[in-house]
């Protein structure tokens, strides 16, 4: 089937280009120089397609660039791709690499052929249809050229749609009936649009440019409102919308991954209204219409009806997901339908009569071949853990800048790497996702939890124990891209308060810092030993600290961060009935982070049973003693408190006793820096 479709495409393209050359010769031979030069100028946009084809050949690593350049200068670059695809389909068996190579060649050929048809065949079709209609259907050469251009442009759209199905994982082979139905759909819609524009241009001349420009602007704004994510760059995204808006003057192409029923219906409804208005204006509301104009009106209406009927038949009967489309349409029209079956069975896969449909496992191998063959084949040493980060980044950048990456985004109708990975890796259990799509350091960082149970100290008697908290696992990638989790760590507590804040995602440069912070936590947490000693009271004290994990600093053993705690105050657990903990031994603080600020907890107040100290002054004297200690000032780094205009929002409520102590603590904050 591949060879037959490629042969049909080549035959149709050869006939269309031959008729184009014959029409140019015909115009110059009959003295119609204006039409001859206009038909000749239509060939100029083809050089853009040839230049793009040559660049793609170079990106694929083809040798003999000098003769490739000559072929493309002679407008034969697309023909070279036709020859390569037919040769691959006929002479190279059905091995997985051969099928993968054939799919890549067909993808390149379909994309370039569609671009060539839109830039060359579309304008040539409008020109030849106008000449044929202006001659009252008497000039045979422009009529034949217009007919072949019409068929060639329609087949280019069908081939592009088939290419989209080939590039998708677990694709279904299209039957000949589906291809024929798509051809009728495209020919009907294109014929109605071209005839209405040509008939209006025949009467109002240049005003057809106003109609086309207005339609272009409306379609461009509609595309902007749809927010396609195929192109990431802002400048390229705007250019993409402008170009697709120009394409929508003649035909519709889907660039969105969501269901397109409403978009297709809206587009063709607008086209029907525009065509009807243009016909009514061109024929003076069907009063005194000549015979040629009347036949043109009949052709427009019949073409639109044939296109609509073919469109409905294709999506209801011949589409690979036709059963799902029917069920969705019935649910939308008639509400939910009760089914006796517990689960809806998937639609049967369309089987080609020749039996050339690859199964899902073979397709996974082909897709893996397609994407991994874009760069150099990795050596056995590179498959081990010794692969450097620089090599991964270079392979990533080379793949993301390759033209096959653009074709893959067009096929899956999305530019999101996570969605492309999910589509390629979730097709079947045995499908091996290409490593280049899954080796993004940024994605790995998002999927990696910030803390694990092994990294945190787990001793229940440690004075500064970081209890096992909730890990950030199972979070969707879309949420992890916009959310960053900061932990509020409790001393001598079994609870960990997590607050989720809206922050930009961590960059790739911050990932070594995160890894270093985790290593410091694991190493220093094991060294921290020694129980706290104190008395059990009715009221307990819990100290909360906020750690900004995106700005961690490496901790040096030579300059430990010491937490000075008064012996007269007890740090006990918030739960009632907890036995008294022994006295704490001064040890290095296991969490070495910058910008640590004390956050008062629910029970953060001095103990009522502490003798020899007033309840209102115990906390103030403790911090003042820490500030006056010269040995502590020389050995500890100074860490400023956060500014008053930048409060730290926490999920920890504040008790009424804390508010009574604010005046004393505010005076301390103005006199000293905070030491840990």
Curated annotation (Swiss-Prot):
Belongs to the XK family. GO terms for cellular component: plasma membrane. The keyword Transcription does not apply. Its main location: membrane. Residues 498-509 have a biased composition (Polar residues). The chain crosses the membrane at residues 37-57, 114-134, 140-160, 206-226, 239-259, 266-286, 294-314. It is found in: Cell membrane. Keywords: Cell membrane, Membrane, Transmembrane, Transmembrane helix. InterPro entries: XK-rel, XK-related_scramblase. The gene is Xkr5. This is XK-related protein 5. It comes from the Eukaryota. Residues 336-362, 372-391, 495-538, 598-661 are annotated as: Disordered. It is a multi-pass membrane protein. PANTHER family: XK-RELATED PROTEIN, XK-RELATED PROTEIN 5.
């Amino acid at each position: 089937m591949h060879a037959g479709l490629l042969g049909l495409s080549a035959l149709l393209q050869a006939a269309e280009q031959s008729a184009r050359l014959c029409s140019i010769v015909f115009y110059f031979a009959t003295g119609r120089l204006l039409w001859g030069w206009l038909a000749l100028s239509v060939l100029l946009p083809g050089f853009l397609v040839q230049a793009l084809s040559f660049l793609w050949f170079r990106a694929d690593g083809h040798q003999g660039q000098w003769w490739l350049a000559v072929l493309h200068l002679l407008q034969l670059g697309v023909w070279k791709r036709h020859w390569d695809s037919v040769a691959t389909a006929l002479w190279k068996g059905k091995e997985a690499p051969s099928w993968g190579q054939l799919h890549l060649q067909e993808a390149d050929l379909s994309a370039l052929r569609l671009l060539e048809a839109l830039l060359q065949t579309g304008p040539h079709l409008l020109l030849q249809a106008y000449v044929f209609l202006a001659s009252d259907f008497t000039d045979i050469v422009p009529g034949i050229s217009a007919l072949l251009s019409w068929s060639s442009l329609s087949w280019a759209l069908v081939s592009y749609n088939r290419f989209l199905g080939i590039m998708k994982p677990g694709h279904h082979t299209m039957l000949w009936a589906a291809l024929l139905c798509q051809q009728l759909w495209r020919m009907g819609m294109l014929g109605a649009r071209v005839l209405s524009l040509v008939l209006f241009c025949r009467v109002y001349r240049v005003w057809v440019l106003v109609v086309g420009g207005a339609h272009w602007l409306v379609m461009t704004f509609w595309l902007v409102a749809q927010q396609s994510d195929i192109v990431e760059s802002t400048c390229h995204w705007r250019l993409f919308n402008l170009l697709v808006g120009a394409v929508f003057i003649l035909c519709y192409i889907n660039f969105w991954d969501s269901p397109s029923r409403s978009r297709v219906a809206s587009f063709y409804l607008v086209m029907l209204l525009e065509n009807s208005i243009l016909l009514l204006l061109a024929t003076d509301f069907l009063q005194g219409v000549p015979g040629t104009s009347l036949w043109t009106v009949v052709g427009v209406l019949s073409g639109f009806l044939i296109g609509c009927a073919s469109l409905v038949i294709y999506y209801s009967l011949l589409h690979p997901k036709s059963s799902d489309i029917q069920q969705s349409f019935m649910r939308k029209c008639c509400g939910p339908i009760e089914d006796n079956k517990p689960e809806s069975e998937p639609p049967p896969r369309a089987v080609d009569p020749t039996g050339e449909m690859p199964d899902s496992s073979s397709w996974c191998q082909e897709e893996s071949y397609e994407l991994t063959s874009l760069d150099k084949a990795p050596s056995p040493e590179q498959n081990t853990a010794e692969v450097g980060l620089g090599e991964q980044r270079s392979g990533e950048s080379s793949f993301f800048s390759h033209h096959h990456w653009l074709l893959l985004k067009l096929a899956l109708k999305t530019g999101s790497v996570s969605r492309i990975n999910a589509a390629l890796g979730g097709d079947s259990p045995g499908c091996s996702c290409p490593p280049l799509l899954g080796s993004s350091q940024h994605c790995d960082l998002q999927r990696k939890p910030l803390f694990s149970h092994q990294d945190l100290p787990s001793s229940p008697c440690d004075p500064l124990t970081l209890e096992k908290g909730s890990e950030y696992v199972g979070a969707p990638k879309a949420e992890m891209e916009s959310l960053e989790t900061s932990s509020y760590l409790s001393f001598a507590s079994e609870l960990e308060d997590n607050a989720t804040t809206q922050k930009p995602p961590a960059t790739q440069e911050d990932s070594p810092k995160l890894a270093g912070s985790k290593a410091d936590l694991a190493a220093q947490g094991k060294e921290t030993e020694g129980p706290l000693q104190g008395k059990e009271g009715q009221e307990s004290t819990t100290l909360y600290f906020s750690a900004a994990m995106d700005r961690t600093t490496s901790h040096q053993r030579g300059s430990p961060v010491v937490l000075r705690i008064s012996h007269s105050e007890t740090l006990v657990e918030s739960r009632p009935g907890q036995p008294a903990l022994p006295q704490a031994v001064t040890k290095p603080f296991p969490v070495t982070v910058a910008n640590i600020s004390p956050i008062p907890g629910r029970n953060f107040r001095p103990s009522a049973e502490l003798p020899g100290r007033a309840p209102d002054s115990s906390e103030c004297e403790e911090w003042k003693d820490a500030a006056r200690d010269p040995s502590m000032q020389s050995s500890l780094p100074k860490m400023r408190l956060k500014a008053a205009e930048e409060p730290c929002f926490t999920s920890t409520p504040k008790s009424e006793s804390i508010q009574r102590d604010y005046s004393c603590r505010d005076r301390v904050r103005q006199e000293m820096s905070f030491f840990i």
